Amino acid sequence: CESTLVDDLLHGGYSRLSVLDISQTAIDFTKARLGSLASGVEWIVANVTEADFPKHAYDVWHDRAVFHFLTAASQRHAYVERVANAVRPGGHVIIGTFGPEGPTKCSGLNVQRYDADSLHGEFGARFRLIDRQKELHQTPFGTTQQFLYCFCVIGSRDACPKSATSR
């Protein structure tokens, strides 16, 4: 939980925030960093592919660097179904994964790399691809890793047209 997204959102006045991590240690670290602001966040320690989320409870789902660790099709399917259930129709989904030129391993684990079409293909027609963006992420070790971010709007179970701007 080195990401400071939750800090930035809290300082920006956002509320009704949830943070999920599989690691209690990471959650505790982030809570300590936030101090009294941590009480304004729902903290969830769980495997995202197994967690139960309330139906249509979220306006925005942001995943930076989890999805690419899901190397089994069954894990990816479980993840997508949870997102589709948890995010309200018309809600936004932002997924950040390693891009096609990103590393093949991270922290000793195999990862799945994506381009925008293959990542959107994992999510399917319910997720309308609005935009995509590649980024070179500077690691703490002084190297760079290619990331791909896809921005989607979720529709109903009925098919949504696929569209995107190119970058």
Language-model features and meaning:
Residues 1-56, 70-167:
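Class I (Rossmann-like) S-adenosyl-L-methionine-dependent methyltransferase catalytic domain
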Residues 62:
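A conserved beta-strand element that flanks and buttresses the S-adenosyl-L-methionine
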